[in-house]
Curated annotation (Swiss-Prot):
This protein's name: UPF0178 protein YaiI
Gene name linked to the record: yaiI
Pfam families: DUF188
Entries under HAMAP family matching the protein: UPF0178 (MF_00489)
Family: Belongs to the UPF0178 family.
Matching NCBIfam families: PRK00124.1 (NF001095)
């Protein structure tokens, strides 16, 4: 099992949580980005640099992730594809995407894209709060406990 991170858009504070978790869990953590990243020295943490371009990092994560892996992303289509492959998906605010919720999220994303294309200003997400960081850490821990239970 591996934790895959859509690292270009992942907040640094979330990456820090993931670095500590990878060490504690002794779980491979792969940060996929189209730029060089600095990560702490660890046998569990590595970076995968991809070419710049639209969805290049996302496509690489989808190509390499497997059932049982965890994908960290705020990108709804990437989360949907990861779930289709049997991976779990979690956004940096601590929301776990599920097969039941991802369809709704895709519909809302498409609706917001339509609004923006018609010239309506929809605004962006709020900045990451302490509550978001705590929710992320809690949901990551919950996923890890599920993995441990399945392993036996």
């Amino acid at each position: 099992m591996t934790i895959w991170v859509d690292a270009d858009a992942c907040p640094n504070v979330i990456k820090e949580i993931l670095y500590r978790a990878a060490e504690r869990m002794q779980m491979p953590l792969v940060l996929v980005a189209n730029q060089s990243l600095r990560v702490p020295p660890s046998r569990f943490i590595r970076t995968l640099r991809v070419a710049a371009g639209f969805d290049v990092a996302d496509n690489e994560i989808v190509r390499q992730c497997e059932a049982g892996d965890l994908v960290i992303t705020a990108d709804i289509p990437l989360a949907a594809e990861a779930i289709e492959k049997g991976a779990a998906a979690l956004n940096p605010r601590g929301e776990r995407y599920t097969p039941a919720t991802i369809r709704e999220r895709l519909t809302m994303r498409d609706f917001m894209d339509t609004l923006r294309a018609s010239g309506i200003q929809t605004g962006g997400p709020d900045s990451l709060s302490q509550r978001d960081r705590q929710a992320f850490a809690a949901e990551l821990e919950k996923w890890w406990l599920e993995v441990q239970r399945c392993r036996g």
